């Protein structure tokens, strides 16, 4: 089965059009990034795509076609450089860019990808974090 997290990470990178932050200013992680790890990263922005601890859901459609649904977490982390409010604004711009990319095109090999849940908004003196759950569907 396709590694949905890796495909989504590459899809977001390839289609990122924001200039602030530009895609080269972002650390593109292929696993969850904890606050302690983020402090060690030299870049001020992280987009992390990873699979949560749930298995893919496979369903049988008509004529024996298998459909696989995979959930991928997309974490957006922004370091607080000037103020929490500024970092939150940047994080929301990055969130909107993820939504724009998913609405405009589907990652290669998948027929559907959409944000199904948003949670874990964190604002602290050091960072802001937002987690998005993306459902990705493909033929298995």
Where are these regions (language model features)?
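Compositionally biased, intrinsically disordered low-complexity segments enriched
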Residues: 32-36, 72, 119, 135
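Generic low-polarity alpha-helical segments
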Residues: 8, 12, 46-51, 70-78, ...
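Short, conserved charged micro-motifs
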Residues: 83-90
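Acidic-leaning, charged glycine-interspersed low-complexity segments
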Residues: 18-23, 43-46, 92-140
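Oligomerization/assembly interface segments of phage tail-like spikes and tubes
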Residues: 64-83, 126-140
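Small/polar-rich, solvent-exposed N-terminal microdomains that initiate assembly or binding
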Residues: 1-63
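Intrinsic disorder/low-complexity detector
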Residues: 26, 39, 46-49, 59, ...
């Amino acid at each position: 089965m396709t590694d949905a997290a890796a495909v989504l990470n590459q899809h977001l990178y390839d289609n990122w059009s924001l200039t602030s932050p530009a895609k080269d200013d972002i650390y593109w992680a292929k696993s969850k990034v904890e606050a302690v790890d983020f402090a060690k990263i030299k870049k001020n922005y992280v987009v992390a795509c990873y699979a949560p601890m749930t298995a893919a859901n496979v369903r049988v459609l008509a004529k024996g076609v298998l459909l696989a649904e995979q959930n991928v977490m997309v974490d957006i982390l922004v370091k607080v450089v000037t103020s929490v409010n500024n970092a939150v604004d940047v994080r929301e711009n990055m969130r909107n860019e993820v939504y724009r990319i998913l609405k405009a095109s589907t990652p290669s090999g998948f027929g559907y990808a959409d944000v199904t849940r948003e949670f874990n908004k964190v604002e602290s003196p050091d960072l802001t974090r937002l987690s998005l759950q993306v459902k990705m569907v493909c033929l298995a």
